[in-house]
UniProtKB/Swiss-Prot annotation:
Annotated pathway: Amino-acid biosynthesis; L-methionine biosynthesis via salvage pathway; L-methionine from S-methyl-5-thio-alpha-D-ribose 1-phosphate: step 5/6
GO molecular function: acireductone dioxygenase (Ni2+-requiring) activity; acireductone dioxygenase [iron(II)-requiring] activity; iron ion binding; nickel cation binding
Similarity remark: Belongs to the acireductone dioxygenase (ARD) family.
Stated name of the protein: Acireductone dioxygenase
Binding site for Ni(2+): H99, H101, E105, H143
Site, as annotated: Important to generate the dianion: R107
Positions bound to Fe(2+): H99, H101, E105, H143
Keywords: Amino-acid biosynthesis, Dioxygenase, Iron, Metal-binding, Methionine biosynthesis, Nickel, Oxidoreductase
Catalytically driven reaction(s): 1,2-dihydroxy-5-(methylsulfanyl)pent-1-en-3-one + O2 = 3-(methylsulfanyl)propanoate + CO + formate + 2 H(+); 1,2-dihydroxy-5-(methylsulfanyl)pent-1-en-3-one + O2 = 4-methylsulfanyl-2-oxobutanoate + formate + 2 H(+)
Origin superkingdom: Bacteria
Cofactor(s) required for function per UniProt: Fe(2+); Ni(2+)
Length: 177
């Protein structure tokens, strides 16, 4: 389950209902979707071949079909990051700066973990996401992302239109201080 980390001196938020409420009040959609048991053979592997990525996506297609019908998403892919990915640090450097997109950034974490940071109306906070977490960052929301110390994540990315996913960087620090 996700954990919210706020400014120093404020306790983290760990209870699922409180996490949902905190994020909902800020316009961020969050849910906890259990990864199907029949996907464990693929989610447990560190490295996936392209054919295995597609197989895993198909095992998760019930979520995609629901999002297509309710939210208009048109495509999805699976990003698999781990310490052995060539150029991992360069890839991550694109996302750990504060930026926004003109479309939602929608992720379903099916293995591993990472951290989204947000700047909303002068408030900064982190959302540590883990397996089974679903998060939708609203369009035009200043945020950043980085992997936690485990440096491992598998996430389904859902898109309405790929052109809306280009990062637009802003002059803002990603520090909670």
């Amino acid at each position: 389950m996700a954990t919210i980390v706020r400014q120093k001196g404020l306790a983290p938020i760990e209870e699922t209902s409180e996490v949902k409420s905190f994020l909902k009040e800020r316009g961020i959609d969050y849910d906890h979707w259990k990864v199907p048991y029949n996907a464990a053979d693929l989610t447990d592997k560190e490295i996936l071949a392209d054919v295995e990525k597609e197989e895993l996506l198909k095992k998760l297609d019930d979520r995609f079909e629901t999002l297509k019908e309710k939210e208009g998403y048109q495509s999805r892919d699976l990003i698999v990051l781990h310490p052995n990915v060539s150029g991992l640090n360069d890839m991550l450097a694109k996302f750990d700066r504060v930026h926004y997109h003109t479309d939602e950034e929608v992720r379903y974490i099916v293995d591993g973990s990472g951290v989204f940071g947000f700047v909303l109306k002068g408030e900064k906070f982190l959302v540590h996401v883990v397996k089974d977490d679903f998060i939708s960052v609203p369009r035009n929301t200043n945020h950043w992302f980085y992997l936690d110390d485990k440096k491992r994540i598998k996430a389904v990315r859902y898109f309405r239109d790929m052109s809306g996913w280009v990062p637009n960087y802003v002059e803002e620090t990603n520090s909670l201080d």
